[in-house]
Amino acid sequence: MFVPTLDAKIVGEVINEYRKRKGISQEVLSGLADIGRTHLSAIERGKRKPTLETLYRIATALDVNMSDIVIEIEKRIKL
């Protein structure tokens, strides 16, 4: 079974796009998700991969299901 590598850059792009659609800054999102702004910035730039807990916090702060973010990531990995 093929399991694609989770590309940190794709994860970051997806989170960044969801944040911008919501119309909030990294500062606001990091506060809502209870993570550091520099940590969020590193995730969005593809420098760090979020843990499941962090991804859940980000999704909750964005008022979206974590599965929606994961589905979008999967779509881009398969392209």
Predicted regions and their residues:
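Helix-turn-helix DNA-binding elements, focusing on the entry/boundary residues of the two helices
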Residues: 15, 26, 37, 52-55
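The alpha-helix within a helix-turn-helix
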Residues: 19, 30, 59
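DNA major-groove recognition helix of helix-turn-helix/homeodomain DNA-binding modules
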Residues: 53-68
